[in-house]
Structure formats: structure tokens, C-alpha cells
Amino acid sequence: MRRASRRAMRSYMRYFYEAFALTGTSEEQILARVRADLSPRLRTDLQRDSIVLALGHMGNWDLVGAWACRRLSTVLTVAERLEPADLFDQFVAFRERLGMRIIGQGRGEKVFDRLVAAARDGGPYVIPLLADRDLSASGVDVDLCGHTARFAAGPAALAERLDLPLYTGTMHYERLSVERRRAAGSPWGLVLTLREV
């Protein structure tokens, strides 16, 4: 248990270090830190319109979002409003500097229609939404490793409303080889896997 706890805390601290250092990271370093395993259909779908990604809380979605803005399309997503408001504003400005378009959501605030309108305005977008935590009463029960878990319905509902393809996104850290480590400016990289549902 201690070993697993130490690994989890190391991963969490790595995320915060990477996130806070990201604005000082070069474009070449961002591109070198992410290795993508993409569905063959993904680029074709993006040529037609936006795509929706159902994500879990894992890895560093800020780094992958910066990568996606450079390699796929502009990222349009929702961020939970934090208190104090100045902290939230700083997080939004940080993500916007990385190339993302952010819609803020306060507690109890309905954001779905605003997200639909934003998705119809411009694009195509990569629209990543966290699905492994339901903050509303409208989640759906799914089977997760033999147990029932409540997931957010937002990604599937948005894809259905806008008639967009839905993908799942996962990621994990990997140690980088000497050459890639040098290019990334970090011993760690992320493997991003995107598959259509």
C-alpha cells in the first residue's frame, strides 16, 4: 500500500510540476512529450467536423490539450469554476495561452447549451470532456470492472445532439529514451490513446 501511495503521490506532483512549467515549454518540447496512438478514423472525422472525447482523470490533459491544439485542432472544453475567482481566471488564461478555448462552469450551472453554441461557432474542435465523475443528477450507470459506476452523460449527449463522432481518451506516462528525452526536456512523456466509440 505504501509503495502504491508513493507512486500515486509522485505522479500527482509530476502533474503539478508539468502544468505549472508548461507555459515556459517550447513547442518542440510539447510535441516530443506526447506520443499519440490515434484511431485511423480520427483525422478523417476532424476534416469533416468536430469530435467529442470522453476522458478520465489521468495523466496531464493540459499538456495533451496543448499538443492537440498543435497536431489535431483547437481544443474546446469546460472548466469547473474554482474559488477564489482569481485562481479560476488564472487557470483559464493559462489554458488559453496554450491555444484552448475554455467555457467556465460554476456549481449547479447548466453549461450544455453554451457548449453546443460554442461548438457550432467555428471549429472543427477537439472537445474533451471528463466522463469518469458525474457532478449532476443526470449521470448514467455503467459497468466498470464488474462494478456499477456513475459516469457523466455529457460527452455522449453532446456527440448525439451535434451528430459528432464520440471517442474515448486515455493516457499513461512513459519514460523517454535518450534522444526523445533531450527533445522533450523531461524524462517523462505521455502516451495518448484515442478510439472511436
Descriptions of predicted regions:
Residues 1-33:
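Negatively charged linear elements and acidic catalytic determinants
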Residues 23-197:
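Soluble catalytic domains of membrane acyltransferases
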